[in-house]
Amino acid sequence: MRRDQAQRPIIIAAGGTGGHFFPAEALAAELKRRGRQIVLMTDARSGGLTSTVFADTDRFVLPGAGIAGRGIRRAGQAVIALGHGVVKAGALLRRLEAGCIVGFGGYPCIPPVLGARLRARNVPVILHEQNAVLGRANRLLARKIHCLALSFASTSHVPAGTRTLVTGNPVRPAIAALAGTSYTPPGTEGVINLLILGGSLGARVLSDVVPAALALLPPALRQRMRVTQQCRAEDIDRVRMAYAACGIEAILAPFFTDVATLIADAHLVIARAGASTVAELATIGRPAIMVPLPGAIDDHQTANARILVDAQGGWMIRQPDFTPDTLAARIAGLLAEPGTLADAARNAARLGMQDAVARLADTVEQSLDTARAPQGDFKGEIKS
């Protein structure tokens, strides 16, 4: 007996790095709270990301969901794996009687979406784009879906004719719980909390430059610094020694489970400009110096950082200019003007869409109600 549309599981297709996975986790938590059944389709890389939300969720690892690579041989292997992934996803979607598919970009969302077009054409597909530049997987699939949910109205590279809806970028429940936490800039005395985030894969340049920059600050400032820094496991010992050499207290780890509290406690954040980091800074409202990843596809991290900079919610230093001297001068200047930090915190908070996860969940539930309509009935814009 076939299930009613509203009782069918919602398929979340996400994996790879935290930038794709964390918004998916936030949506899953909200949909579970609403009593919906969730199934995760992902790649092998997501196994390294800690998630209590998906701990009791059916999880299917699909071949072809992590096909990045270079070279003719690798490309051929990727095409074969992708084909297997599409076939497997299509069969799973039919067996599970999926109600809706929500993809979060990156290669892990390709097999389920193409599988749906092959074997489950009546299943509505929603894609979410976290960055200010539409990712290549989402660009490839955009014309095959019911709705494209955007984090920013100004997102570029959206194909003409795509039905779009601005929902914002969902953040994890722990981040949302601290939305709009009041900010007090550091005074002339007391501890200065500095948080350095390198993304879910770490960022060696931050481990190289930040300790050297702080060592250039006057001793009176250094002795007030309390640094919490995310860095690769293999870098921890040398970074710890660098901070110890200049008398700075530092907590170092490859990954922090309490990142929401760390952001809320920070006077200043130095970070990559991944979509989740930008969304988390805006949700809580904290000033940040952004260092975009120079090799990011389509330079999307620079576009993300530009959103924050244009709103006067932070500052950007491109990696070629990210030297100890440049960073030390910027930090010293900001600490000398606490009002500037406070203004940036307020401006960052104005960017935050605190109801992003509710907006996206509403869109998903609406798709269940309109699944039989050939074009759906979303109240989004058609991109011209």
Curated annotation (Swiss-Prot):
Listed GO CC annotations: plasma membrane
The protein's name in its UniProt record: UDP-N-acetylglucosamine--N-acetylmuramyl-(pentapeptide) pyrophosphoryl-undecaprenol N-acetylglucosamine transferase
Main location (coarse class): membrane
Similarity remark: Belongs to the glycosyltransferase 28 family. MurG subfamily.
An annotated Gene Ontology molecular function: UDP-N-acetyl-D-glucosamine:N-acetylmuramoyl-L-alanyl-D-glutamyl-meso-2,6-diaminopimelyl-D-alanyl-D-alanine-diphosphoundecaprenol 4-beta-N-acetylglucosaminlytransferase activity
Pathway the protein takes part in: Cell wall biogenesis; peptidoglycan biosynthesis
EC number(s) from the headed UniProt entry: 2.4.1.227
Keywords annotated in UniProt: Cell cycle, Cell division, Cell inner membrane, Cell membrane, Cell shape, Cell wall biogenesis/degradation, Glycosyltransferase, Membrane, Peptidoglycan synthesis, Transferase
General function of this protein: Cell wall formation. Catalyzes the transfer of a GlcNAc subunit on undecaprenyl-pyrophosphoryl-MurNAc-pentapeptide (lipid intermediate I) to form undecaprenyl-pyrophosphoryl-MurNAc-(pentapeptide)GlcNAc (lipid intermediate II).
Location in or out of the cell: Cell inner membrane
Catalytic reaction(s) noted: di-trans,octa-cis-undecaprenyl diphospho-N-acetyl-alpha-D-muramoyl-L-alanyl-D-glutamyl-meso-2,6-diaminopimeloyl-D-alanyl-D-alanine + UDP-N-acetyl-alpha-D-glucosamine = di-trans,octa-cis-undecaprenyl diphospho-[N-acetyl-alpha-D-glucosaminyl-(1->4)]-N-acetyl-alpha-D-muramoyl-L-alanyl-D-glutamyl-meso-2,6-diaminopimeloyl-D-alanyl-D-alanine + UDP + H(+)
InterPro entries associated with the record: GlcNAc_MurG (IPR006009), Glyco_trans_28_C (IPR007235), GlycoTrans_28_N (IPR004276)
Broad enzyme group: transferase
GO-annotated biological processes: carbohydrate metabolic process; cell division; cell wall organization; lipid glycosylation; peptidoglycan biosynthetic process; regulation of cell shape
Topological category with respect to the lipid bilayer: Peripheral membrane protein
